[in-house]
């Protein structure tokens, strides 16, 4: 039987040495929200607690300024 190895999750922001996550960096923020607009939890992405808080704050600011949608299309 073949054994499947799960890739080890790591925090991209820690690896790159990011000081602060910017709410204007929409390309990065879009990687951390689902198609429906929800914030992806850190247990899925592997983001550390410090950067998960910054990420949530940045996404909420971007939503408030209409840079990101709150939800997907309302149909």
Swiss-Prot record:
Part of the 30S ribosomal subunit. Forms a tight heterodimer with protein bS6. The gene is rpsR. InterPro entries: Ribosomal_bS18, Ribosomal_bS18_CS, Ribosomal_bS18_sf. Binds as a heterodimer with protein bS6 to the central domain of the 16S rRNA, where it helps stabilize the platform of the 30S subunit. One of its GO terms (biological process) is translation. This is Small ribosomal subunit protein bS18. GO terms for molecular function: small ribosomal subunit rRNA binding; structural constituent of ribosome. Keywords: Ribonucleoprotein, Ribosomal protein, RNA-binding, rRNA-binding. Pfam families: Ribosomal_S18. It comes from the Bacteria. GO terms for cellular component: cytosolic small ribosomal subunit. Belongs to the bacterial ribosomal protein bS18 family. It comes from Shewanella amazonensis (strain ATCC BAA-1098 / SB2B). Signal peptide: none annotated.
